[in-house]
Amino acid sequence: MPSPPLGVVQRRLTFTHQRVYPGLTNEPRHWVRSNPQATAIAFLMRDDNGVAQLWLISPQGGEPRQLTHHATGVQSAFNWHPSGKWLGLVLENRIACCDAQSGRIDFLTARHDNPPSADAVVFSPDGRHVAWMEEVKGFRQLWVTETGR
């Protein structure tokens, strides 16, 4: 069986078996993401009410910190803003930015009849715009808006 290269150390960061909803959530589908500074890893996990929320953990270990506390839950995969100060996601059928320190949500769009695609919310390299996909009349379309950041 192949093993990691010599000197590579693997560590488990989350121990969630005692939680009401153990483990990271698989819905919405997402990928864990490190901030640009490599000081925080973001992921989705259900809170004690079973609602998918955004959480952060240090790559050095420690307790996960719940970042969002929203009644309806995160609806999509997420991405870090290039500054590492915000995360982009879908919430309440709207594109939103979440402050990575406080968890404050700023909505960037009005509520859409069709929810934006749960695949991803993607920032431009300068962080001034965000793009996403949304279905219109049976076809996925590409959308973009300014972030104000």
Q: Which residues fall in each region the model found?
A:
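Sequence signature of WD/YWTD-type beta-propeller architectures
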Residues: 1-149
